[in-house]
């Protein structure tokens, strides 16, 4: 049988030559870029038009930038929206984008990305940028030292004479297993981002998670006992912290994001690509988060629609009625049922930890 002939014109605009295969349609570069930009544009519409919110005054949104391809591409897309908003004299008030970079070298042993931060400021002048070390969580969240001390248990002592960086590193070293370490780091990063957003009086946070990251996060949360947190960790809407969480790239495949990034050379100096997982790493030495990311990455290339359906199914979930106005875990912030309320110390009712956080405690993790 003769092979299927490729179209000589873009299947969208019918003018330019096709350059990409986009969801079974051969499209040109301009249509490819337009299609992907429309995804976050649609999800940012309510902020652009100020629907159900004040029409005057600032509407600040925080974008955490990790220098990864997804968060960098999201920043590029939202900056294009800001350019379009500013070009209209009588257009809607729109929104502001505040970019927060938690310096990667203070989280893991990687070199500082000084040139990337400077290049991001130069490339996206309509956004304001802030860079903070991981240990600045002590300044932004005054209660975190008490929470960490009780969370780590009686064998851990928080030495306040040490620098904030040393105090945080000692606490992180007290966590034993790979899954617990990854889980605790994500909670601390989330607390830092939320605390900074509140300090800057932001209305919400826009996260640069792609469909694969959201699918992996959904599966990992369920495996770690954080299924109740899926409703706000991967879904658009109000979080337990009083801030709106938004995931504008939730309908975009990771492979599409990578291709998009290659079309804009100015992004190359900002993006720090993840190292491919080592084949020699034993499964038992990987965290649940790493296992799920590895699984979704390999299967997502074969079946991208399946991974997208995972996040779409999760977005249909609703918080249980017991979470409304109920107790919140002092560590991760998730709502708890009375059955899973676990106190931080014997007989101490001041701090409560949810079941999932209790599993990651040094004395209980296994």
UniProtKB/Swiss-Prot annotation:
GO terms for MF: nucleotidyltransferase activity; sulfurtransferase activity; tRNA binding
SUPFAM superfamilies: Adenine nucleotide alpha hydrolases-like (SSF52402)
Principal location listed in the UniProt entry: cytoplasm
Pfam families found in the cross-reference section: CTU2
PANTHER family, alphabetized: CYTOPLASMIC TRNA 2-THIOLATION PROTEIN 2
Function of the molecule: Plays a central role in 2-thiolation of mcm(5)S(2)U at tRNA wobble positions of tRNA(Lys), tRNA(Glu) and tRNA(Gln). May act by forming a heterodimer with ncs6 that ligates sulfur from thiocarboxylated urm1 onto the uridine of tRNAs at wobble position. Prior mcm(5) tRNA modification by the elongator complex is required for 2-thiolation. May also be involved in protein urmylation.
Compartments it resides in: Cytoplasm
Intrachain S-S bonds: none
Any one GO BP annotation for this protein: tRNA wobble position uridine thiolation
Family affiliation: Belongs to the CTU2/NCS2 family.
GO cellular component terms given for this protein: cytosol
Pathway: tRNA modification; 5-methoxycarbonylmethyl-2-thiouridine-tRNA biosynthesis
Protein name, as recorded: Cytoplasmic tRNA 2-thiolation protein 2
Record keywords, A-Z: Cytoplasm, tRNA processing
């Amino acid at each position: 049988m003769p092979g299927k002939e490729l179209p000589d014109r873009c299947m969208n605009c019918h003018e330019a030559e096709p350059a990409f295969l986009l969801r079974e349609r051969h499209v040109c570069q301009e249509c490819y870029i337009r299609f992907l930009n429309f995804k976050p544009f649609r999800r940012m519409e309510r902020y652009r038009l100020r629907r159900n919110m004040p029409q005057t005054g600032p509407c600040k949104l925080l974008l955490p930038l990790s220098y990864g391809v997804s968060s960098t591409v999201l920043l590029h897309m939202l900056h294009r929206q800001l350019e379009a908003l500013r070009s209209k004299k009588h257009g809607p008030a729109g929104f502001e984008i505040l970019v927060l970079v938690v310096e990667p070298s203070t989280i893991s042993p990687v070199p500082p990305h000084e040139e990337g931060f400077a290049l991001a400021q130069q490339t996206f002048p309509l956004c304001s940028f802030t860079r903070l070390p991981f240990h600045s969580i002590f300044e932004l969240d005054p209660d975190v030292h008490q929470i960490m001390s009780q969370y780590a248990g009686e064998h851990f002592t928080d030495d306040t004479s040490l620098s904030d960086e040393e105090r945080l590193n000692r606490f992180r070293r007290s966590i034993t297993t790979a899954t617990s370490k990854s889980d605790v780091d994500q909670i601390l990063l989330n607390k830092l981002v939320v605390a900074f957003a509140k300090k800057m009086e932001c209305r919400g946070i826009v996260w640069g998670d792609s469909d694969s990251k959201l699918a992996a996060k959904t599966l990992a949360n369920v495996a770690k006992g954080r299924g109740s947190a899926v409703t706000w960790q991967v879904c658009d809407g109000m979080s337990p912290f009083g801030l709106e969480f938004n995931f504008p790239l939730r309908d975009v495949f990771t492979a599409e994001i990578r291709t998009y990034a290659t079309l804009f050379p100015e992004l190359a100096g900002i993006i720090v690509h993840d190292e491919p997982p080592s084949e020699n790493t034993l499964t038992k030495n990987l965290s649940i988060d790493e296992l799920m990311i590895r699984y979704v990455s390999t299967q997502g290339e074969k079946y991208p629609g399946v991974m997208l359906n995972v996040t779409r199914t999760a977005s249909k979930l609703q918080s249980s009625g017991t979470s409304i106005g109920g107790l919140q875990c002092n560590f991760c912030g998730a709502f708890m049922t009375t059955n899973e309320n676990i106190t931080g110390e014997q007989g101490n009712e001041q701090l409560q930890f949810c079941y999932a956080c209790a599993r990651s405690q040094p004395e209980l993790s296994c």
